[in-house]
Regions:
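S-adenosyl-L-methionine-dependent nucleic acid methyltransferase catalytic domains
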Residues: 1-134, 143, 147, 156, ...
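Short hydrophobic/aromatic beta-strand element in the GNAT-like acyltransferase core
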Residues: 152
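Short helix-loop capping/hinge motifs at secondary-structure junctions, enriched
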Residues: 160-163
């Protein structure tokens, strides 16, 4: 595949077109299957949309390319899909490559569902768990503390990585306090500070290749451009490919 492009392609299909050990860094956040966990992949009806919060979330999922199914799979199918994606990421990562996988603990039936359920079934090693403190949440529960955090799982093929936390003289903890990004016609954009923080830990005189297989509005790719690295983005929906290309064009023309 040609570098420094956003491809309108399904994440798994795009990954399968990449050569073995061809990517230095993967930074991504897949759909969370929030509705699939709740509805077990059943078609959504008015009976499923009992709360205003669920209705808002449903509308956001419809906005995600107009395809509700992207966030409404049977949970076992979703987990199998994530395992397949992650194992393809393992294949395309270089031996000292790293993947940063943003996900969250989800609630179902009063119990927390952790991404570790499927992470430990992949070929990747969990090198470190980073807590992303977003500082605010639209979700308020009378029986729980406010859920203001998500997780960024640093996944590797082994112990060796390109990480160098000392080169820039800035040593960070594993808790990152970074506010949510302002929406940019995508329902769940990455804050660029989050991706910048990751890439700052991988200073290199080489042109590293950075991949985002769920690139959305391409914040990962823009951060890679800032660092002088090459990028690849996969996005299933053409409207977000167009949004990405527009954002990249505006950024590079500054």
């Amino acid at each position: 595949m040609e570098l420094n492009k956003i491809y309108c392609i399904d994440a798994l299909e795009g990954l399968k077109q990449l050569e073995d050990e061809s990517v230095d860094l993967i930074i991504t956040s897949p759909p969370y299957n929030k509705h699939g966990l709740r509805n077990n992949g059943r078609p959504v009806t008015n009976n499923n949309l009992k709360s205003a919060a669920v209705q808002r979330s449903w509308v956001q999922s419809i906005a995600y390319g107009g395809d509700y199914n992207v966030d409404n799979m049977k949970e076992e199918d979703y987990e199998r899909w994530q395992i397949e994606i992650l194992n393809e990421c393992y294949r395309v990562l270089k031996k000292d490559g790293s993947m940063f996988y943003n996900h969250k603990n989800r609630l179902y039936g009063g119990e927390v569902y952790s991404p570790y359920k499927w992470l430990y079934k992949t070929k990747l090693m969990v090198h470190q768990e980073i807590v992303w403190d977003m500082g605010a949440t639209p979700i308020v529960s009378p029986i729980r503390w406010l859920p203001t955090t998500e997780r960024i799982y640093w996944l590797t093929k082994g112990k060796q990585t390109k990480f160098n936390r000392n080169k820039n003289g800035d040593i960070k903890s594993e808790v990152w306090r970074i506010n949510r990004a302002t929406r940019n016609n995508h329902p769940a954009p990455f804050p660029i500070k989050l991706v910048d923080t990751i890439l700052d830990g991988f200073p290199s005189d080489e042109k590293l290749i950075v991949l985002d297989p769920f690139c959305g509005s391409s914040t990962t790719c823009i951060s890679a451009i800032k660092k002088g690295y090459d990028y690849l983005g996969f996005e299933k929906f053409q409207e977000y490919v167009d949004l990405s290309n527009d954002r990249i064009k505006k950024f590079t023309e500054k």
